[in-house]
């Protein structure tokens, strides 16, 4: 792959078997009963904030979506940042970040309101107008998706500033609800179910 300055850049590809094993090991850790939080959420900060783990996740996303040829990675504060940066590093492209509230230090911004698919509440996010050039190919990345409200909001925000969303990639996507607010997406892991009473968690890897 061409480097940022035109030369050649080495891309550390892993085998599909190695990636599948790595993701399977993460599932074993995530399926621990003590990770279940109120509301059926799963504690995963220790994984997505681990430099070695999140770096490998970014490389896997790059390998599995390189044909999309993104020019920018886009995520939302705050938990999407580590995975977004790791994927951006693997692709050797910039990352832009949407905020829940615009900041005056970032200049004029475009803001949208969106319906959170999990909380069913109206929320907002903003992106500096200068963050993405018109026509830029954007890969949206986030840490978790249940109904897809946040991911859909990111897509709408990117399109609002004139960018083209070429894909949506998640670390974990919940199997239910089956009908998401985003039509097409991919994930590294799938949450098939969680029982708050028994503390049973069922997370499986998306194998290649």
Task: Enumerate the language-model features and the residues they cover.
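Active-site-facing substrate-recognition patch
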Residues: 2-69
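Short glycine-rich phosphate-binding loop at a beta-alpha junction
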Residues: 70-77
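Conserved acidic residues
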Residues: 71, 136, 166
């Amino acid at each position: 792959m061409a480097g940022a300055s035109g030369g050649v850049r080495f891309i550390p590809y892993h085998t599909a078997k190695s990636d599948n094993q790595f993701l399977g090991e993460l599932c074993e850790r995530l399926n621990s009963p003590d990770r279940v939080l109120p509301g059926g959420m799963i504690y995963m900060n220790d994984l997505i904030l681990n430099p070695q783990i999140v770096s490998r996740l970014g490389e896997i996303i790059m390998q599995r979506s390189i044909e999309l040829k993104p020019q920018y990675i886009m995520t939302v504060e705050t938990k999407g940042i580590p995975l977004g940066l790791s994927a951006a590093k693997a692709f050797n492209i910039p990352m832009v970040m949407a905020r829940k509230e615009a900041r005056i230090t970032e200049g004029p911004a475009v803001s949208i309101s969106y319906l959170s698919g999990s909380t069913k509440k109206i929320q907002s996010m903003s992106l500096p107008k200068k963050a993405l050039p018109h026509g830029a190919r954007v890969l949206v990345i986030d840490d978790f998706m249940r109904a897809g409200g946040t991911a859909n909001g990111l897509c709408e925000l990117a399109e609002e500033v004139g960018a083209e969303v070429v894909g949506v990639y998640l670390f974990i996507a919940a199997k239910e609800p089956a009908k998401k607010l985003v039509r097409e997406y991919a994930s590294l892991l799938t949450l098939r179910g969680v029982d708050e009473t028994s503390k049973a968690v069922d997370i499986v890897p998306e194998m290649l």
